[in-house]
Amino acid sequence: MRYRELGKTGLKVSEIGLGAEWLERHNAEEVKAVIDCCEAQGINILDCWMAEPNVRSNIGVAIAGKRERWIIQGHFGSTWQDGQYVRTRDMEKVKPAFEDLLSRLGTDYLDLGMIHFVDEEAEFHRIMDGAFFAYVKEQKARGVIRHIGLSTHNPKVGVLAAQSGEIEMLLFSINPAFDLLPASEDINTYFAPDYEEHLGGIHPDRARLYQVCEQQEIGITVMKGYAGGRLFSAETSPFRVALTPVQCIHYALTRPAVASVLAGYDTPEHVLAAGA
């Protein structure tokens, strides 16, 4: 496994990481098998954005006694309400959900505290000027989080974050298909079944984000590296050609400022395929 500096955070992360979303559909034994395989492959960074209680607890059990070998990326604003995930900026919901994450993971700190899922420019400004960001900064001052990050699918929001002087790293969606598209505040745009035929090359909105992040030393961890798996099938890929996990990971790792691709794994075999 190779490792890269995550921007100016001082953290060294594995080029391939664990995006733990798919673990939500597995029991504790299966989660532990995947995480053990990740450790054996030298993976040292995981993202847990999910609010579902069981998956948080199962990850906590799997890393028990080994917390220090993991760089954990956890999220502010991902909550579990009435049996379902809700993204919110309501501080009465945000605070207990964040405390629940720490408790279930069995840790008293996160390496990367992420402002969760900000795709609208107006919302970015509201967050940064309000109680939500004040709470995030308070957690950093207390040492509960070591660095402040933000997750977005919108390159224009990413640029705002990278230039803010407050955000230290980004979780951003990168794959060969998404890079063709202009900025959008609607995530569904990126999963359209067909792309317009005139699209070609990296869209300027996204090229600018990569340039700004490199200039500002804002490291990027990558989500949606496989476009939710659609790039693996010629039928669902906008290129009408099936790509492999290794091809998708290589693509993301060659973008400026990218430090780690957080792939999703259902099984240890998926981990091995990503690291091939």
Give the predicted meaning of each segment.
Residues 1-74, 108, 141:
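N-terminal binding-site loop/beta-alpha segment at the start of enzyme catalytic domains
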Residues 118-276:
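Beta/alpha (TIM)-barrel catalytic core signal, keyed to glycine-rich beta->alpha loops juxtaposed to Asp/Glu
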Residues 100-124:
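Active-site groove signature of glycoside hydrolases
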Residues 25-38, 89-106, 152-160, 243-251:
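Short, acidic/polar
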Residues 5, 13-17, 44-45, 69-73, ...:
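Structural preference for beta-strand elements that scaffold enzyme active sites
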Residues 7-23, 73-86, 114-117, 226-230:
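N-terminal small/glycine-rich loop or linker at the start of catalytic domains
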Residues 37, 41, 105, 165, ...:
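Structural motif
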Residues 17-29, 79-95, 121, 125, ...:
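Active-site mouth loops of central-metabolism enzymes
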